């Protein structure tokens, strides 16, 4: 029991120290992913979050190294075969350029994806870009578009992401 408490304490401390030293942002996202197969579009939702324990800012340009964990729900297309649910763990590099109330961003992620229903684990790469709107000193809403390169389930999609913390 003490090991788990110590581990949680260390994780919280490391997270707090990284937030205090750099003030990175954390993000919570809800996305829609689509795959095209047999001339149909399959849509599913992705829930998750990411945080950037390491990052730099030079004037209006911010570079960060986010870690993202997400869960994608399964969905059923009209012909009856399911898009498998999946769990993702990815790390990446991200650049964000700030204007007065608007920011543009581009990210690249690489990681692993677990498909429990088909008992497969595979690598996935993802390119993401979009626009964000600052709603205050520590809050912004981003609208990302992404394409995921995956041997099992390549997908294109978009969503809404809320960023909190740091100087957004």
Cite the ranges covered by each PLM segment:
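Gram-negative (and chloroplast) outer-membrane scaffold detector with strong preference
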Residues: 46-129, 133-147
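Predominantly the C-terminal beta-signal and adjacent terminal strand-loop region
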Residues: 22, 32-39, 122-168
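Positively charged n-region of N-terminal signal peptides that target proteins for export
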Residues: 1-4
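Short glycine/proline- and aromatic-enriched beta-strand/turn motifs that initiate or cap beta-hairpins
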Residues: 18-79, 157, 161-168
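Short amphipathic alpha-helical "recognition" segments used for binding
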Residues: 6-7, 35, 100, 132
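Bacterial N-terminal signal peptides
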Residues: 7-16
């Amino acid at each position: 029991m003490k090991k788990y408490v110590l581990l949680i304490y260390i994780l919280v401390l490391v997270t707090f120290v990284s937030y205090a030293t750099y003030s990175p942002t954390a993000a919570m996202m809800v996305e829609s992913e689509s795959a095209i197969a047999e001339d149909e579009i399959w849509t599913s939702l992705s829930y998750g979050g990411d945080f950037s324990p390491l990052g730099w800012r030079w004037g209006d340009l911010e570079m960060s190294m986010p870690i993202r964990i997400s869960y994608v729900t399964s969905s059923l297309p009209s012909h009856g075969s399911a898009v498998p649910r999946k769990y993702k763990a990815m790390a990446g590099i991200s650049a964000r350029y700030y204007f007065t109330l608007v920011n543009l961003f581009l990210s690249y992620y690489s990681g692993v994806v677990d498909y429990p229903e088909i008992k497969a684990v595979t690598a996935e790469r993802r390119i993401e870009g979009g626009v964000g709107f600052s709603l205050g000193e520590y809050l912004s809403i981003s609208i990302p578009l992404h394409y995921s390169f995956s041997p099992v389930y390549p997908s294109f999609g978009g969503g809404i992401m809320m960023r909190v913390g740091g100087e957004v």
